[in-house]
Amino acid sequence: MNLKIAIIVICQLVYFTQGDTVPSKPLSVDYQAEFSWDLYKKLYPEFRRNMVISPYSLRKIFVCLHQLTDAKDPATTKFSKQLHKVFKFNPTGQLPDLVRRRYENQREAYAQDQGLNTTTLAVVLGRKKKTTHALNNLPKSCGIFARSLKSGSPKQMTRSLNAAMKNISNGAAQSFLSESDLNRDWDFFVADSWLFKGFWRYQFEEEYTTTCNFYTNAKKKGLMRFMYLEEMLRVGHFPQWNVRAVELPLHRESPFSCVLMMPVAADIEELIESLSHKRFKEIYDNMSASKTTVRLPQFRLRMKLSAKSMLEQLGFDTAFKESVFRVFEKDGAIPLGDAIQKMDLSMAHEGEDLAKTYVDRSLGQQFTAHQPFMFVIFDRKELVPIIVGNVVAAITPKDVGPQSDEKLCDNPPRFNGR
């Protein structure tokens, strides 16, 4: 059996929310954030469907894997150049202190919440030779553990890997890998798992849940359950940027938050194409608190992405095609088989506090996500996108009932794009 190594990254996110949001501080060029927006913008035209991804996590994986390379190896030089070109990261040998501190701060932020679990597991399969000091002692900010597993059938190896992941994550990660995820020709494998279930600052009012149409375009629609929330929220309407936005704060102790964005008139692709770290910061900083009614479809997105197929199209192929990573003390370097990211994201009613009861008759601001919209879950301190995604087609539940009357569906809203 060929040499096999698996690195499994699990980030189970049951995000919690903040109270009052502090306006962001002026930021210089943030390459971590810029890469997140760039990769998302490049992927959307290829998918053109409901999607969710964590570009931030993919970047962190490859930045940390650079610690397993030999600076004297020509393959490392090519790998470093591609890291700089594609991931906007300039490797300088050891993980720079600034990057190390940033990853450590983010790792500590994840650990603040009981519902958050992040685990990275490096697994050697079918090999008894001693692993390198570098593999076993990657920077703590990377959060990577190392394990060795015996070779066996795909079923046995999958079961062993899943058991190891479950054990290290304290039961949070279960049955992440399937037999089809393992390729016997791989030497090195990365699995990146994210689970997010929004636990909001304010609970959506379940008694006002309605079944209404979600419009993919002017002709195509489908039924979805829409959640209802009326509360003082940060909101913005910016025709100059073709965007309407609202912030759904997570639990008050969370360092993260969520912003929903819809185009004002043009198609969502034009909105996505216009986004960058600078533009998102402009949008976020210009939002203001106002009484706001939000109608958001209740949905769950699950997605599997191959980093290899995505990144090779962007010119990042050395890691997969050449022997770059040194994981054994007496053996040469080996390539990476793939980095598979699995996302499981749910938007549901659960929240920390009940929304306030308003006695005034003013309608306030309205944000009804009845047509293609995008969402970003981000670090409030630096506005770094952690998870980015979009809903462009109805996700109709199997047990959905008949459409609610027009009044409950806002008489009803219609698609306003092109």
Curated annotation (Swiss-Prot):
It comes from the Eukaryota. Female salivary gland (at protein level). This is FXa-directed anticoagulant. Disulfide bonds: none annotated. Belongs to the serpin family. The lineage of its organism: Eukaryota, Metazoa, Ecdysozoa, Arthropoda, Hexapoda. It comes from Aedes albopictus (Asian tiger mosquito). Glycans are attached at residues 117, 167, 286. InterPro entries: Serpin_dom (IPR023796), Serpin_fam (IPR000215), Serpin_sf (IPR036186), Serpin_sf_1 (IPR042178), Serpin_sf_2 (IPR042185). Interacts with host coagulation factor X/F10 (activated). The keyword Signal applies. Anticoagulant and antithrombotic serpin-type protein inhibiting host coagulation factor Xa (F10). Does not inhibit host uPA/urokinase-type plasminogen activator (PLAU), kallikrein, granzyme B (GZMB), matriptase, elastase, alpha-chymotrypsin, chymase, coagulation factor XIIa (F12), coagulation factor XIa (F11), plasmin (PLG), thrombin (F2), trypsin and cathepsin G (CTSG). Inhibits factor Xa-induced production of pro-inflammatory cytokines, such as MCP-1/CCL2, TNF-alpha/TNF, IL-1beta/IL1B, IL6, IL8/CXCL8 and IL18, in human endothelial cells. The keyword Signal applies. It is found in: Secreted. Keywords: Blood coagulation cascade inhibiting toxin, Glycoprotein, Hemostasis impairing toxin, Heparin-binding, Immunity, Lipid-binding, Protease inhibitor, Secreted, Serine protease inhibitor, Signal, Toxin. GO terms for cellular component: extracellular space. Residues 1-19 form the signal peptide. Binds to heparin; binding to heparin does not affect the interaction with host coagulation factor Xa (F10). Instead, heparin may function as an anchor that targets FXa-directed anticoagulant to endothelial cells. Binds to phosphatidylcholine and phosphatidylethanolamine but not to phosphatidylserine. Heparin-binding site is also required for phospholipid binding. GO terms for molecular function: heparin binding; lipid binding; serine-type endopeptidase inhibitor activity; toxin activity. Pfam families: Serpin. Its main location: secreted. One of its GO terms (biological process) is immune system process.
